[in-house]
Amino acid sequence: MEHTEPEKTDLKSVDLIEMEDTEKLIGTKRKFTDVPIVFRPKKKRVIIEYEPNTLDIPVSDQESFLKLSAPYITQLYSAPNVTEYTLRDFFVRDKIMPGLIQIQEKMFNIKKTSIRPCYICKRPMTKVHWFYLYQCNECGNESLKYRYASRNLYGKNALVIGGRIKLGYQIALKLLRAGCRVMITTRSVHNALEFYNQEPDYNEFKSRLFVYSKGFDLGKARESLPDLVNEITNLFGQQQLDILIQNAAQTICFQENIDNKQQEFESLSEAEILDLVKKRGGKRLTFPPVDWRVDFAERYGRVLDRRSINTWSKNIYETSDEEIISVIQSNMIGSILIDKYLIPNMRPSEDTYVIHVHAKEGTFDTHKTMKHTHTNIAKAGLAMLTRCLAGQSENDTEPRSQWPQIHGVNPGWFSIDEYTIYARTRGKIFNPPIDEIDAASRVVHPIFFQKKSYCKSWIDYKKCHHF
C-alpha cells in the first residue's frame, strides 16, 4: 500500500480570533507550528434580560416596605455627597439588616442564566441579589454581614496612610466607629477634614481623629518619615501604635490632565457623559442594563480625567520616565520605608496589625497585557513585601517576631478613577461590583476578626492561595 503524507493544514485558513491590541501595536506575530492552534474567542458583552420586577424589602420596626426596582447599591453610587451616602448606608445597617432573615430570598430574576458569573463565587447567576449588582443571593448575604461587621477597638491607636478620600477615608471611618484613635496622612492637610465633618456622626468620633500636621507624599517618604514617627510618638506614646494601614498609592498621574483631544469633553458633566455612553452604543457593551446604570456622583471632589488617554491604557514605551519613577517610588520604595520606620514603633502585642492594600495588577497568575506595566510592577513589589514580612505561615522555619500581624488585602474593584472621559463615552466601563465601604470592609477584616499573619493576599474575605 502506498504511504501518503497526511494533509497539512493551511494555517492561513484558520479562523483566528482577533489578536491582543498590544500585539498589534508592536507588530509582533504569533509563531505557529504544524499543529493548528485554536484560539478561544472573546466573549461578547451581552445585556442580560431581567424581569421587570419590584422588590418589597421589609423595614425593621415599621409596617412598611422599601420598594426597589434596581439593586440598592445603585442608590449609593448616585449619592451626591458623603452625608447622603452614609445615611443611605446606615438605613440598610439599622433598618434592613436586623430583619435580614426575612429577605433571604429577595432577588431580581433573570430570564435566562447569565453568562456573567457571580463576583464572589464565580458561578453563573440566575438571580441577582437585592443589594449588589453582580452577586448571587448566598454571596450577597455573606458580603452584607462582613460589610457591617465591627469590633471593640477602644484603647487602640491606628495610622492610615492616605486617609482623606475614598478607600482610606472609609477605612478610617470604620476604625473610628469601632472606637479606635486614628491619625491620617494626606498631601492636602488644609482640607483633610473636609469630608469627615460632613458625616452625620462626626461629633461622636471627632475627638479621636487626628491629622498629621505636614503634607505626606509617599514619593518623598524618606524625608517625611522621621517627623511622622516623632508626631505619632508624641500623640500616642512610645511604641503605642496598634494598627498601620498602608493605603496610599499612585496609579495615574493627573498633573498633566489635558491634551489636544479634550475639547469634545471639556465641559461635560458626569450625567452628560453617561448620556453619551448610551448614545454611542453603551447599551450593547454594558452589564447590567443601561436602566440600572447610574450617574457616579463625585462625592470627594476629584477632577475628572479629561485626557483622551492616560497611562492606564499605555504601554511602558509610551509612558514618561517621570511617571514610571513616581509610581515605583510611591508604591514600592515608600511602602518599604514606612514599614521599616514604623513597625519598630508598634506596640509589642500579638493584637497589632499591618495591612498592605494589594491589587489584582500585582498578581502573577492572571492575564497581563503591556498596559500600565509600571503599575503592575509596583503592585507586585508590594505583594512581595507582604510575603517577606509575613513569612510562610505555619510552614515557616525562619524565626520571626510574633507581632505585628502582617496582611495584604485586595479590596476589589470599587472605583472608575483610572478611566478617562473618553473611555467613559465609549461605553467601555461598567458599574463596579462593590463600593468603597465594601472595599474598606475587606481591608479591616483581618483586624476585626483577629487573623494571624498571612503571606499572600486576602480576596473577598478569604485567603488567596496563589501568588
Curated annotation (Swiss-Prot):
Disulfide bonds: none annotated. Coiled coil: none annotated. InterPro entries: Fungal_SecMetab_SDRs, NAD(P)-bd_dom_sf, SDR_fam. Transmembrane segments: none annotated. Gene3D superfamilies: NAD(P)-binding Rossmann-like Domain (3.40.50.720). It holds the Pfam family adh_short. It comes from the Viruses. GO terms for molecular function: oxidoreductase activity. PANTHER family: OXIDOREDUCTASE, SHORT-CHAIN DEHYDROGENASE/REDUCTASE. This is Uncharacterized protein R665. It comes from Acanthamoeba polyphaga mimivirus (APMV).
